[in-house]
Amino acid sequence: MKEERPIIALDFSSFEETKAFLDLFPAEEKLYVKIGMELYYAQGPDIVRSIKSLGHNVFLDLKLHDIPNTVRAAMAVLKELDIDMATVHAAGGVEMLKAAREGLGQGPTLIAVTQLTSTSEDQMRGDQNIQTSLLESVLHYSKGAAKAQLDGVVCSAQEVEAIKAVTPTGFTCLTPGIRPKGSNIGDQKRVMTPNQARRIGSDYIVVGRPITQAKDPVAAYQAIKAEWAG
């Protein structure tokens, strides 16, 4: 089921920056935001509690990757923060993914990171020594996530249709690397516009700098939200 709101990546390191950004939006505008490593490691669990207290949904993107027992225990701790979504690295293997699901329980959405959208096929082959195609690697990780009873994967929009063809009905595809037409793609290698992501079947999109660094973040958010809605 498609999330109607684009998820905003809060690419900040301080509580003050985060609060100043969120305060730009009307109180009745309930957002879906992504807290990544930078903000969480700088501010800790309190930043999650603070944002949740405002009524926003929180996607905690820490990409856990460790032995199964450690990941299970860490997810059990994160569950207490009432997060709405969390991530693990699919490369940790099916047993680790199952442990993550056990720790987080069935309430929050749990998705696996396949290949980062900053990774090209040449980089994957050279750095990771994976000699299949990038798409084949993503599909392999996606099938492992489905086997472990995860809700979906993080993937490039270019991979959504192929993933949905090899995973159960309802398997979720969250797409970062979304850029409005004409914007700077930054360090992303595999990008799409909100409209393209919608048409190809993405269930969630994540947008950071085109909103957080816009001259008018609220207007930028509303424009992207409208394009995503179709």
From Swiss-Prot:
Biological processes annotated in GO: 'de novo' pyrimidine nucleobase biosynthetic process; 'de novo' UMP biosynthetic process
Protein's recorded name: Orotidine 5'-phosphate decarboxylase
InterPro entries: Aldolase_TIM (IPR013785), OMPdecase (IPR014732), OMPdecase_AS (IPR018089), OMPdecase_bac (IPR047596), OMPdeCOase_dom (IPR001754), RibuloseP-bd_barrel (IPR011060)
Lineage summary: Bacteria, Bacillati, Bacillota, Bacilli, Lactobacillales
Keywords: Decarboxylase, Lyase, Pyrimidine biosynthesis
Subunit structure: Homodimer.
Role this protein plays: Catalyzes the decarboxylation of orotidine 5'-monophosphate (OMP) to uridine 5'-monophosphate (UMP).
Active site (catalytic residues): 63
GO molecular function terms noted in the UniProt entry: orotidine-5'-phosphate decarboxylase activity
Keyword NADP belongs to the record: no
Pathway: Pyrimidine metabolism; UMP biosynthesis via de novo pathway; UMP from orotate: step 2/2
PANTHER family in the record: OROTIDINE 5'-PHOSPHATE DECARBOXYLASE
Protein family (similarity comment): Belongs to the OMP decarboxylase family. Type 1 subfamily.
E.C. designation(s): 4.1.1.23
Root EC class: lyase
GO cellular component: cytosol
Record-linked SUPFAM superfamilies: Ribulose-phoshate binding barrel
Binding positions (substrate): 11, 34, 61-70, 117, 179, 188, 208-209
Catalytic activity: orotidine 5'-phosphate + H(+) = UMP + CO2
NCBIfam families reported for this sequence: PRK00230.1, pyrF
